[in-house]
Amino acid sequence: MELEWDEAKRLANVQKHGLDFAEVSSLDWDNATFLEDARRKYSEPRFWAFAMKGPWLHVVTFCLRGAKVRVISFRKANDREVKRHGPKAT
């Protein structure tokens, strides 16, 4: 998977969430849950991936640009998201 991102956004994400966009490639993508972010009309479709990294569920907001995954946000999942999308969710 080829990743891309805005460098200023990556630095802001590290500051806010302590997670670097470069770590997104180490998520368990094979077992991820994907949802479209339809909260508003964006200029291009956005998606959420809920995937494990170690013992923690993480959330990646991204869009697709050709064959590349453009990372928009990367953070640990909140309690509600863990219940809904975590490994023990049904």
Language-model region placement:
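Ribonuclease/tRNase effector modules and their secretory precursors
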Residues: 1-90
